[in-house]
Amino acid sequence: MMSYDVIVIGAGVVGSAVARELSRYQLKAAVLEKELDVACGNSSRNTGMLHAGFTYKPGSLKAECAVEGNQEFDQVAKELGVPFKRTGKLVVGFTDHDRENILKYKAIGEENGVKGMRMIDKDEINRIDPNAGGEFAMYVPSSGILDPMQYTIGLAENACQNGVKFHFGQKVTGITRDEAKDVWVVKTENDTFETKWVINCAGMYASEISEMLGYPNYPVKGFKGEYYVLDKKAGKFLSIPVYPAPNDKGGFSTHATPTVDGNVLVGPDSYVTEDREDYVVTKEHMDGLFRDGSKMFKQMKREYFIRNFAGIRWKRYNPETGEILDFLLESDDAHPHTVNLVGIESPGVTCALPLARRAVALLVKKEQPQKNENFDPVRLVKKRFHEMSHEEQMAAIKENPLYGEVVCRCETVTKAEILDAIRNPLGVCTVTGIKNRTRATMGRCQGGYCETRITEMIEQEKHLAPEEVRYSKRDSYIFTGKVRDVK
């Protein structure tokens, strides 16, 4: 049986942020994740937006953490080597009702402490970005864009480098209390762990873990949203996220958002689902994204579409009124040595570190652990080959000839970079894991050229048979066997 001072359940963006905060202290900490890598759930299935905090109820945990997370992110991105651009955001409108709602949420944002928001006319929209839709808009300068996969990976790798242990493929099946030893016994499909503290960061499964810890199985509702990914050709025409006016409840419909790597995301829409992992996309919703996205982004063309995907936000709600509730972060003596986080959805990426600090502070207040004097907040990241100058590329190839072998032609990812990703600090290795660390397979051909080459490199580096290589999740085996021998 493996024993720890604290176990975090879930390695999404919040769980990884909690792990990093724990590594600031002299604690034996671990993270249990049911999948084979970090960011395998909705931490990788979102817009990658750094939210400003103008649609959340004043005084709510969402509002406090969104504003706090937004204000600190330049420094966080620098420490972790995470791509980030403070682009600002346009919240555009077409009707008088749109204007009323925008002004309503502008006032809420100001009450929450969001700085610099202002109303602009169509001429100024065109000066900011001529391809943005709208007759008028609210300009929000503090918003930004980031890569949520890279951010989650950065948090987790920094935590790992500072001493936190990550256990992957460990789906939690039960948690019991051993009062005699003053510990929790956490059982997974594969192992048993013993820990004094448990922090629940299980995302869409947080309600089930909550119940295992003795808290309520809080009602949650799934809101699914579908997306288009547009080619980098489209990215040349959009420099700022363009959102429609929020609805009466503060929700947004389809928007157009440039990514830090030059693509454009169009979506999400929103509809209720009961399936926690229903990531299928549908023609009906894709057609709706094209229609609504064209209002936000004037250069919307089907020829730019290279991929689609879906994400699901599991929101805590009141079953009697249907009201969507605030993030829940709780800890009490009736459930000793636990911190319970439930209903963490958008803006979870923006709020991850502020939530983590609050969660870890509850443990620190009780335990008074010594600080980790060797904690290093900086994660060293190599510059991507395609971002290097010609002189830098030649120097890199001279030092390591594998930089001269391009594996992914669309994104110019080299063999040296693929091998670095395979040898990552977390020790994880799937095709999607390589994709999220390098952008290989994310280009126009979506892996048509490089995916089999990456698979072969994984086989060789990890000493796996082809049938053992997985695409992303636990059962996502790519190959089932040989068709024939090639001579």
Where do the model's predicted regions map?
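Short beta-strand to alpha-helix junction loop
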Residues: 58, 62-67, 92-101, 139-157, ...
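Helical element adjacent to the flavin cofactor pocket in flavoenzyme catalytic cores
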Residues: 139-197
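Local cysteine-cluster metal-coordination motifs and their immediate loop/turn environment
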Residues: 405-418, 438-456
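N-terminal Rossmann-like FAD-binding beta1-loop-alpha1 element of flavoenzymes
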Residues: 4-31
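Dinucleotide-binding Rossmann-like beta1-alpha1 core, especially the glycine-rich loop
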Residues: 48-128, 134, 251-254
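Glycine-rich FAD pyrophosphate-binding loop
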Residues: 24-44
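Flavin-dependent oxidoreductases
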Residues: 17, 175-182, 187-267, 271-280, ...
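C-terminal catalytic lobe of FAD-dependent flavoproteins
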Residues: 148, 260-261, 272, 277-406, ...
